[in-house]
From Swiss-Prot:
Residues 624-659 form the UVR domain. This is UvrABC system protein B. It comes from Legionella pneumophila subsp. pneumophila (strain Philadelphia 1 / ATCC 33152 / DSM 7513). Keywords: ATP-binding, Cytoplasm, DNA damage, DNA excision, DNA repair, Excision nuclease, Nucleotide-binding, SOS response. The beta-hairpin motif is involved in DNA binding. The keyword Nucleotide-binding applies. It comes from the Bacteria. CDD domains: DEXHc_UvrB, SF2_C_UvrB. Forms a heterotetramer with UvrA during the search for lesions. Interacts with UvrC in an incision complex. It is found in: Cytoplasm. PROSITE patterns: HELICASE_ATP_BIND_1, HELICASE_CTER, UVR.
Length: 663
């Protein structure tokens, strides 16, 4: 237990970090259920939490409000704890259209989904780490409160093999089939097994690039080895191995049979209800759909939409909470909720939206009432299951403020950087004044963020600035995650100088190059101009030594006053600390790649950086062929969330298209 977690870093805690670390550790050791780390932008909150984890030596679940932030946190913790099981647990859907029915137009929408296999593998790897290891750190999104396979059923389906034990080949193959592995005679892929005589090759569903070889002799396990499925090279001989199921929803045969019987009973009860209400179409529809599912479960052990029968598969009572990732956590685990002012309300809002859609499906005979128990956790259920918790935010929400037993403040940054100076200027001349400021900041080699209230205003401002020779881009809600990452990358690289948007605070990403944040119409009260939003937006300039914020307003609203007072309080504390310790503020020097470090660090190690080929002497046919090849690569990387690689290929792709146009 002495060195269960070990941080690898060139830095030591500084600024307010040592005090915050000591305060949080003391709170955890005293048994406090909920604490808050109130840390300003750029104060090293992740580093503080890493030290808390190292000191407490407990498995940890870290929840972020979106995949982008989760990927960033995963990259940071992976760098801090290279020897530990840092895992990634987010929704594995690239695209998801839930099953739904619209009574007004009598339209039924079938469930349609595209699953990202690599993220599915990482989810399986995350639960495996929680089961097998004490040094697990899981970075997750709100996906953690959604139904997952029952841990008891999952554990009962594990396949344990040891060298020298008696084991019949047919039994092993049967168990692999029950675990939903598929047999192949071709190249081995994840979730498959292959048989050659007495040799069984298995590619575990939770493994990224290593497979297992089982060699049998006379119904005895003669040898177990890890090998590379691509080259066939033996990597390591093993005394024993545990193969985990292909999916979290795998269920023992006897539980499937029990489920089928319970579903039949519920079906008869529901049909009687519908017939009594003279809902004959709904009754016929329900009987047809449910009988088909029953047949599939009996034949294959699963069916499409099997999660709708999860109440019976996990042996729960009606209304009982579904098993989730929280059921895989050991009792001594820690829970860290990042950007809690966003994440906590998000957790609270998931249940109702899901419930409304499913009630329609039940009422119109598409699903049995038990399908309502395939749902995310209610907020009170989430609270019951949460272990000791630390909320992290620069602007904690009302829930954290009310329920936290201890607030550790982290206002002083290790770099000595001070919160941006805030100026208030009149609305009347805001556009002309802004343009003047933009030109000054660009001349210094820095970048600018501008936040507006409406989409229309953002578009008009972008067009106006562009007409006046300023390199500007517009970030809005229709931009998907990959493109959003590319836009932020391009801003940092200087491809353009000004980013205009409506809600630029939701990224939570590091942009040290931003020296000016301009907030237009700051005196219009509302969500986008609340105290919390203003503090978060002003904080976007806090990573730059010359960071400033300009609020364009004719009156000072209550939210503005509170935000200004809090910012000034922080500035005074930071200045006093710097003066007392003789610290000169230093800018953050962070490479552009750092922002994009996410869930694919392991993969990137195998990529060799090649010099861009010279295409000047290529024929149009060769260029077209290369453009098509690059386009496929670009979309493949983007689909796998490999943002950095996708962006690099995109740059080359655009160069080639430009060259082709000149021919």
């Amino acid at each position: 237990m002495k060195d269960l977690f070990k941080i690898y870093s060139n830095y030591q805690p500084a600024g307010d970090q040592p005090t915050a670390i000591a305060s949080l550790i003391d709170g955890l050791e005293s048994g406090l259920a909920k604490q808050t780390l109130l840390g300003v932008t750029g104060s090293g909150k992740t580093f503080t939490i890493a030290h808390v984890i190292q000191a407490m030596k407990r498995p940890t679940l870290i929840m972020a409000p979106n995949k982008t932030l989760a990927a960033q946190l995963y990259g940071e913790f992976k760098a801090f704890f290279p020897d530990n099981a840092v895992e990634y647990f987010v929704s594995y859907y690239d695209y998801y259209q839930p099953e739904a029915y619209v009574p007004a137009s009598d339209t039924f929408i079938e469930k349609d989904a595209s699953i990202n296999e690599h993220i599915e593998q990482m989810r399986l790897s995350a639960t495996k780490a929680l089961i097998e290891r004490k040094d697990a750190i899981i970075v997750a999104t709100v996906s953690a409160i959604y139904g997952l396979g029952d841990p008891d059923s999952y554990l009962r389906m594990l396949l344990h093999l040891s060298r020298g034990e008696q084991s019949d080949q047919r039994k092993i193959l049967k168990r692999l089939a029950e675990m939903q592995y598929t047999r192949t005679n071709l190249s081995l892929e994840r979730g498959q097994f292959r048989v050659h005589g007495d040799v069984i090759d298995i590619f575990p569903a939770d493994s990224e690039k290593e497979a297992i070889r089982i060699e049998l002799f006379d119904d005895e396990v003669d040898n177990i080895a890890r090998f590379d499925p691509l080259t066939g090279e033996i990597l390591q001989r093993l005394p024993r191995v545990t193969i985990f199921p292909k999916t979290h929803y795998v269920t023992p045969r006897e539980r499937i049979l029990e489920t089928v019987e319970k579903v039949k009973v519920e079906l008869q009860e529901r049909l009687a209800e519908l017939n009594a209400q003279n809902k004959l179409v709904e009754a016929q529809r329900l009987e047809q759909r449910t009988c088909f599912d029953i047949e599939m479960m009996l034949e294959l052990g699963y069916c499409s939409g099997i999660e709708n029968y999860s109440r019976y598969l996990s042996n729960r009572e009606a209304g009982e909470a579904p098993p989730t990732l929280f059921d895989y956590l050991p009792p001594e685990a820690l829970l860290i909720i990042d950007e809690s002012h966003v994440t906590v309300p998000q957790i609270g809002g998931m249940y109702r939206g899901d419930r409304a859609r499913k009630e329609t499906l039940v009422n119109y005979g598409f699903r049995l009432p038990s399908a309502l128990d395939n749902r995310p956790l209610r907020f009170e259920e989430f609270e019951e299951r949460s272990p000791q918790t630390i909320y992290i935010s620069a602007t904690p929400g009302p829930y954290e403020q009310e329920h936290s037993d201890n607030v550790a403040e982290q206002v002083v940054r290790p770099t000595g950087l001070i919160d941006p100076e805030v100026e208030i200027r009149p609305v009347k001349t805001q556009v002309d004044d802004l343009m003047s400021e933009i030109r000054q900041v660009i001349a210094q080699g820095s970048r600018i963020l501008v936040t507006t209230l409406t989409k229309r205003m953002a578009e008009d401002l972008t067009e106006y600035l562009s007409e006046h020779g300023i390199k500007v881009r517009y970030l809005h809600s229709d931009v998907d995650t990959v493109e959003r990452m590319e836009i932020i990358r391009d801003l940092r690289l200087g491809e353009f100088d000004v980013l205009v948007g409506i809600n630029l605070l939701r990224e939570g990403l590091d942009m040290p190059e931003v020296a000016l944040v301009a907030i237009l119409d700051a005196d219009k009260e509302g969500f986008l101009r609340s105290e919390r939003s203003l503090i978060q937006t002003i904080g976007r300039a806090a990573r730059n030594v010359k960071g400033r914020a300009i609020l364009y307003a004719d009156t000072i609203t209550g939210s503005m006053q509170r935000a200004l007072t809090e910012t000034e309080r922080r500035r005074e504390k930071q200045k006093a600390f710097n003066l007392e310790h003789g610290i000169t503020p230093k800018g953050i020097n962070k490479s552009v790649e750092d922002i994009l470090e996410g869930a694919y660090i392991g993969k990137r190690k195998t990529v060799v950086a090649e010099k861009s080929p010279q295409y000047t002497h290529w024929s149009p046919q060769e260029l077209v062929k290369q453009i098509n090849a690059l386009e496929k690569q670009m979309y493949s990387h983007a689909q796998n969330m490999e943002f950095e690689l996708a962006a690099k290929i995109r740059d080359e792709y655009l160069l080639l298209k430009e060259q082709l146009m000149k021919i």
